[in-house]
């Protein structure tokens, strides 16, 4: 039975099946047509949680058989694929969170389905990505590291053409935030598909995170939003996964439609992020950053409650520390 047949007919795939799939997808010598058929078929099936863990571990082990660890490190990112074309919320959040002293290893990529991915924005900011080997030194000095996915996982470049061909979210969108080269203590992940929240939360637990939040934003975003109830799966320190809804209005933030968060080109997104960090933007765009930064600070144990996290994020922007972190990352 071929791998394609097994993907289409088997309820649960073996770890060996997953390894075969990954080996094909990262091969430079196998044609895009074959990869397209396998990846599109796999992304249409009901993915089992153990399979997602197999995929993540297969990719990590391929590049980092002895995965490095930085105690207390956190990643804040989304799966992408929500087609919202929002500005770079999680990248902006990273500056705020790192300015609180959280060790942030932000793992990002160029855009697949939007106008500007995190790496596109960093290029516009003149902020260099950091190598995996140099990450501890920069974390010690600046508390913030941006690692480009194509640099940390050069094998992923062999998947990019087929992802572009498919033109919609695939299993790789779920995988992206989970393959940080470093073993993380904390993580906050936004997921484009609400039906995958529990799947991702359980996988994050399998990966050994201490605390995490996996969320789906109201009305379809992969960030917490201001437009309604956000769906939250929280991994607690004792290993429990609890789910609940979170509405920004309960924390003193005004309701706003997701359309308020539309971004544009990397140049336009730079202006948006900078005006939030320097305090000039007091609109709902600032509020959505405060909400996501507050959640991140709560996960990273900088505060005891989400409300305190939002309050701390507000202070970090208003007192200039978040902007100072931006300038520090630019070498200024």
UniProtKB/Swiss-Prot annotation:
The protein's Enzyme Commission number: 2.4.2.18
InterPro entries assigned to the protein according to its UniProt record, in alphabetical order: Anthranilate_Pribosyl_Tfrase (IPR005940), Glycosyl_Trfase_fam3 (IPR000312), Nuc_phospho_transferase (IPR035902)
Swiss-Prot/TrEMBL cofactor(s): Mg(2+)
Binding positions (anthranilate 2): 163
Lineage top rank: taxon: Bacteria
Binding site for 5-phospho-alpha-D-ribose 1-diphosphate: 78, 81-82, 86, 88-91, 106-114, 118
GO biological process: L-tryptophan biosynthetic process
Molecular-function annotations in GO: anthranilate phosphoribosyltransferase activity; magnesium ion binding
Keyword Magnesium: yes
Gene3D superfamilies: Nucleoside phosphorylase/phosphoribosyltransferase catalytic domain (3.40.1030.10)
Details of cofactor binding: Binds 2 magnesium ions per monomer.
Positions annotated to bind anthranilate 1: 78, 109
SUPFAM superfamilies: Nucleoside phosphorylase/phosphoribosyltransferase catalytic domain
Classification via Pfam families: Glycos_transf_3
Key word Glycosyltransferase present: yes
Subunit relationships: Homodimer.
Family: Belongs to the anthranilate phosphoribosyltransferase family.
Function: Catalyzes the transfer of the phosphoribosyl group of 5-phosphorylribose-1-pyrophosphate (PRPP) to anthranilate to yield N-(5'-phosphoribosyl)-anthranilate (PRA).
Protein name per the record: Anthranilate phosphoribosyltransferase
